[in-house]
Amino acid sequence: MDSNTVSSFQVDCFLWHVRKQVVDQELGDAPFLDRLRRDQKSLRGRGSTLGLNIEAATHVGKQIVEKILKEESDEALKMTMASTPASRYITDMTIEELSRDWFMLMPKQKVEGPLCIRIDQAIMDKNIMLKANFSVIFDRLETLILLRAFTEEGAIVGEISPLPSFPGHTIEDVKNAIGVLIGGLEWNDNTVRVSKTLQRFAWGSSNENGRPPLTPKQKRKMARTARSKVRRDKMAD
């Protein structure tokens, strides 16, 4: 096992512990608490994958951080902070929409890279909006926290979330997963739109029809899906 992988996990465990203390003292806002909960799941998955105990890793992580801080000068810290771009937290969803439990009548789940896609295949002929909470850096999507698909009535019918055991994903991972989710929902004649906020930070532009540009791979897949559906309809006739 790579030593850097282990030390990174140990430091992440300790930093999570520090952030938890901030929340316990009621100093964290809603986005801070949301990231804390999701990072907890990620750490559990990484700990299981690495075969490391989180409590023991936290203690070692504390020692690593204390050693770094002891050697770090105030001037170096100022320079580091000045040269590091700050990320922003973008919220399409309210806290209620973000934390609400939902159930699928005909569940389908697919893993696309480091992201998990869940779709309720029982949903048909609905107008659906995709909304997401995510962080942004340099005006581009950095990290997806959670994406959900909502009907006009407010029901949740689909979701994209990071896999706890596979930390880290790219903007292309997110766009590919969105393409898969759209294709799955449109299979049942649903009309899917993507929020302007998500379009702007993921694709760099927004369309009035709510449809982001598809990759060549997604276009080919949707064309195959359409041909298959036409053949199925002809057989039914």
Curated annotation (Swiss-Prot):
Annotated phenotype, changing L144A: Complete loss of nuclear mRNA export inhibition
PTM entry text: Upon interferon induction, ISGylated via host HERC5; this results in the impairment of NS1 interaction with RNA targets due to its inability to form homodimers and to interact with host EIF2AK2/PKR.
GO biological process per UniProt: symbiont-mediated suppression of host cytoplasmic pattern recognition receptor signaling pathway via inhibition of RIG-I activity; symbiont-mediated suppression of host gene expression; symbiont-mediated suppression of host innate immune response; symbiont-mediated suppression of host mRNA processing; symbiont-mediated suppression of host PKR/eIFalpha signaling; symbiont-mediated suppression of host type I interferon-mediated signaling pathway
Database matches in Pfam families: Flu_NS1
Effect of mutating L146A: Complete loss of nuclear mRNA export inhibition
Motif Nuclear localization signal boundaries: 34-38
HAMAP family linked: INFV_NS1
Protein's recorded name: Non-structural protein 1
UniProt source species: Influenza A virus (strain A/Udorn/307/1972 H3N2)
